[in-house]
């Protein structure tokens, strides 16, 4: 069960790709020493699984994240995952420092919220982190996962499942600080999962009497990989030695260490990640959406941007338009961004849900719709501009007129 969990995490990482070289990766390494005032949070939590959340008190989404983190702590504790330390580090900026108390009030006394001083080395920078990142360390203080948006949203289960993986698996090798009580928790979870799997298998293969001479086939359920991380996440994950889906004969050997991705959230507008396009262009097998992508695509997009290509753009002849999607999740008021990984001629900048939030989005190109192809229309390039015009609540990729 846990090996499958690690595989699900690893597959998502492979989809997003890393930007940091293997030599620079901090995977399975202790972080640089950092402290706030006279407190050393990593030292204080040594011996327990440690979850460090980088939240910004001036950000509405971060306030929601803090509240959900408290809910997650309670949930995991009820399930027996009690040996976990949670640490929240507020942003160093003046606006965040002024709202520190508001952030602190969103969690209980079990989750300390640390406020950086203005003149101290920035902890976020030391950890190569950004807003809404989650860093998960094992009991020996070694970094196992670094999750960034969108996978650090606590409305997903990626953070939760990553914590459980670190709790029960020795991703970075043996740690002598693992307690017997923790071993018992993991064994109980494994046995419970095994029993549920066996029961589901029995129900699936149990023949049902039919009056028809030809019984109806039962649809096969599609497995949902538990957590993954990905996209702009400084993630340091070890690939599971489990075989990949649809390749049952793959030998169970761990991959080379070069596949331990450390995903960087880029400082500038050039960002990589999953495309949220579920309507894959014809003849483009490489763009077939994965399970994690399909999961993201279930959410409705409410914003669409139409891009203008420069005249010398190679994509202009093969694309009817280029659009960016800004996903908004129900009941959360929070937004995430999906992009494609291919090289594109332009970037789009849109206003976020809040006035101070700017969302940088990569354009995703499509082949012309059937109507465009039938009419033999091509993209009518405008002046060498890379700006995008926002079309709120646009549903379709529109064909430009000549």
Swiss-Prot record:
Q: Where is the signal peptide?
A: 1-19
Q: Which residues are glycosylated?
A: 83, 174
Q: One Pfam match, by short name?
A: SelP_C
The protein's name = Selenoprotein P
- Give GO MF terms, alphabetically: selenium binding
Tissue-wise, where is it found?
A: Brain and kidney. Most prominently expressed in the cerebellar cortex, hippocampus and olfactory bulb.
Spell out the residue ranges making up region: Disordered: 196-291, 367-402
Q: How is it modified after translation?
A: Phosphorylation sites are present in the extracellular medium.
Designated gene of the protein:
SELENOP
Species of origin reads Bos taurus (Bovine)
Composition-biased stretches, type Basic and acidic residues, lie in 232-247
| Comment field on protein domains | The C-terminus is not required for endocytic uptake in the proximal tubule epithelium.
Q: Where do Basic residues bias regions lie?
A: 203-231, 259-269
GO biological process annotation, one example:
selenium compound metabolic process
Q: Where in the sequence is Phosphoserine found?
A: 284
- Where does it localize? Secreted
Give the domain of life.
Eukaryota
């Amino acid at each position: 069960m846990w090996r499958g969990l690690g595989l699900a995490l690893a597959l998502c990482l492979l989809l997003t790709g890393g930007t940091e070289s293997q030599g620079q990766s901090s995977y399975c390494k202790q972080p640089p020493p950092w402290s706030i005032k006279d407190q050393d949070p990593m030292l204080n939590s040594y011996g327990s699984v440690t979850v460090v959340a980088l939240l910004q008190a001036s950000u509405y989404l971060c306030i929601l994240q803090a509240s959900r983190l408290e809910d997650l702590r309670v949930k995991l504790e009820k399930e027996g995952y009690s040996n976990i330390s949670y640490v929240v580090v507020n942003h160093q900026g003046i606006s965040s420092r002024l709202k520190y108390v508001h952030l602190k009030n969103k969690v209980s006394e079990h989750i300390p919220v640390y406020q950086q001083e203005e003149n101290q080395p920035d902890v976020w920078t030391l950890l190569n982190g950004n807003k809404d990142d989650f860093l998960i360390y094992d009991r020996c203080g070694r970094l196992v996962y670094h999750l960034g948006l969108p996978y650090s949203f606590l409305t997903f289960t990626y953070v939760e499942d990553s914590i459980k993986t670190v709790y029960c698996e020795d991703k970075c090798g043996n740690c002598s600080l693992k307690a017997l009580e923790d071993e018992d928790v993991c064994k109980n979870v494994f046995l419970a999962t095994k029993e549920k799997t066996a029961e589901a298998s029995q129900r699936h293969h149990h023949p049902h009497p039919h009056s028809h001479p030809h019984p109806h086939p039962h649809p096969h359920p599609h497995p949902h990989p538990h957590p993954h991380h990905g996209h702009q996440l400084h993630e340091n994950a070890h690939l599971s030695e489990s075989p990949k889906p649809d390749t049952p004969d793959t030998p169970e050997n761990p991959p080379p260490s070069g596949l331990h991705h450390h995903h960087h959230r880029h400082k500038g507008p050039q960002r990589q990640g999953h495309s949220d396009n579920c309507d894959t262009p014809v003849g483009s097998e490489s763009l077939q959406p994965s399970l994690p992508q399909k999961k993201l695509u279930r959410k409705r997009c409410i914003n669409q941007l139409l891009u203008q290509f420069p005249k010398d753009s190679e994509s202009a002849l093969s694309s009817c338009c280029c659009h960016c999607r800004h996903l908004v999740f129900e009941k959360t008021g929070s937004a995430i961004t999906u992009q494609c990984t291919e090289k594109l001629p332009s970037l789009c900048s849109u206003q976020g849900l809040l006035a101070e939030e700017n969302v940088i989005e990569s354009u995703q190109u499509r082949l012309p719709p059937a109507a465009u192809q039938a009419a033999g229309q091509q993209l009518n390039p405008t002046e060498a501009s890379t700006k995008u015009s926002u079309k709120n609540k646009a549903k379709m990729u529109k064909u430009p007129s000549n």
